[in-house]
C-alpha cells in the first residue's frame, strides 16, 4: 500500500538483475538513461556507489541550466536492492531527502523491477516525479533488454 506522497512503479525487464543493477551504478549507463528525453543531456558529477557514498547528476535540456539530483546510498545489496536518498533542485517543485528504493528480482529469466520513491513533501511533488520515472525506466529497459 502506498500513501499520497509515495510513488510505486513495477516493470518486467528482459534482462538479468545483474545487468539492470549495473545501469543504476555505472557512470556511462546513468548518463544514457538519467534524462527526460532525447533533447536532454545528463552528466554524472559524483558517483561513489557504497553505503554512505554519494551521487550527483546534472540533467536537463541541452541549452539550459541543469536540474540537479543528489543523495547518499543508504543500502546496497547487489544485484537485488539499492536504496538512496534523493534531493532535486533547479525545478519548479524541488524536493529534499526523499527516499528511492529499487528492488530487482529474477522472474522467469527476466527482472521484476519495483521502484518506490517516498517521502515527497506533497502529492504534487509525487505527481511531478511520476512524470519522469517511467521514461527513465523505458530508457533503462532499452539499454539492457535482450529482445531489443
Where do the protein language model's features map onto the residues?
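A generic structural micro-feature
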Residues: 3, 47-49, 63-67, 92-96, ...
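Beta-strand/loop substructures that line and gate deep hydrophobic ligand-binding cavities in soluble
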Residues: 83-134
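Hydrophobic ligand-binding cavity/cleft-lining segments
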Residues: 1-41
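A short, structured loop/turn motif at beta-sheet edges
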Residues: 17-18, 49-50, 74-81, 103-112
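Charge-dense, helix-prone N-terminal extensions
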Residues: 4, 10, 18, 45-46, ...
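Hydrophobic pocket/interface hotspot
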Residues: 20, 30, 55, 73, ...
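Short amphipathic alpha-helical signal-transduction/dimerization elements
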Residues: 25, 137-148
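Glycine-rich portal/gate segments that line the openings of hydrophobic small-molecule binding cavities
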Residues: 42-87
